[in-house]
Every structure is written in structure tokens, then in C-alpha cells.
Amino acid sequence: MTTFADLDSTHLDAVVEINNAGYPAVPNTTRAELEQLAKVCSLAWVVLDDAGEVAGFVMAVNPGADYDSENYRYFESHYRNHLYIDRVVLGDSLRGQGVGTTLYAQVFEHAAQAGRDFVTCEVNLEPPNPGSLRFHHRQGFEDVSTQATKGGSVVVQLLAAPLGAVS
């Protein structure tokens, strides 16, 4: 049975490995960078597979955080009461099993309990990540804007889901 748990330091090496296996859909990162991100996050969960091994994760940031991300700054200026999903990656072994939908339902519940109005995120358009974009649309996310980041090397679709969008 797949379970969710709070991310802690014992999970970081596995999280870095899963994250970097998702490149270019998510940026490659180091353990130190993920440790810094975890300090900013209000929500950081791992997805554990049937054997109890880390097979995915999600990291999200509350409004008002001291976080220097081009995409987060966009949402801060347009959606003041939002939970921003900075990173979500599921390993190949979990794909197509409904785990992503279950994970997002939990994220939406967490955001609603915290009094948030929206859950926000971005998905790469360049380099393309069409599967993720389709998944997010199915979860109730709406396209709100696009922007070039990382000096123009990445173009993202900015997405927002009003709470209550997922049944």
C-alpha cells in the first residue's frame, strides 16, 4: 500500500535521486539545494511504496515565504492566498496507478484546512512536459499565464486551481 509521510533528512538522498531522474521536467538539484527548499516549504511529503521505499515526493510553499523563485513570485503577485507546489515527482513505478490523483487530493485538503483559496504550480512547456500538463488539467488546474525562466531557457505554463476543483 502506498503511503505518504513527512519528508525528513533520512529521505533526502532518495528524493534527490527521484528528482534528478525526472529531469528535464524538473530541474536537477543537489541535496543541499533540496535541504534549503525543505526549510522554506510548509508541506514536504514523501510517497512510500509497498516496501516502504521513497518513490515520490511533493514540496509546497505558503504565501509570504522568503523564497526566490521566479514562478513563486508570479503567484505571490497574483494569488496572495495560495499554496504553491514547487516540486512534485513520482517514480515510474507509481505512474498510472492513481497515486498522483490521491496525492493531489491530500495536498488540496491540506491547503483547504490552511484556509488557502488556490493551489498553484507550473509545468514546463519548453522543454515540453505534456503528460504533466494533462494531469494537472484533470486535477482542476487552469492555465493562467506563461513565462520564460532561467534566462529564457525554460518556458512554463503557470496554473492555478481554486480549492474545491477536485471532487
Language model features with spans:
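Active-site rim helix/loop that mediates acceptor-substrate recognition in acyltransferases
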Residues: 24-51, 59, 65
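A short beta-loop-alpha structural element at the N-terminal edge
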Residues: 1-15
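C-terminal "cap" of GNAT-fold acetyltransferases
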Residues: 77, 146-167
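Conserved acetyl-CoA-binding loop-helix of GNAT-fold acetyltransferases
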Residues: 90, 96-109, 138
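A short, internal acetyl-CoA/4′-phosphopantetheine-binding micro-motif in the GNAT/acyltransferase core
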Residues: 76, 86-95, 124-125
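Conserved catalytic-core motifs of GNAT/GCN5-like acyltransferases
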Residues: 122-124, 137-156
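Conserved GNAT acetyl-CoA-binding A-motif
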Residues: 111-125
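Conserved acyl-donor/pantetheine-binding loop and adjacent beta-alpha core of acyl/acetyltransferases
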Residues: 59-87, 151
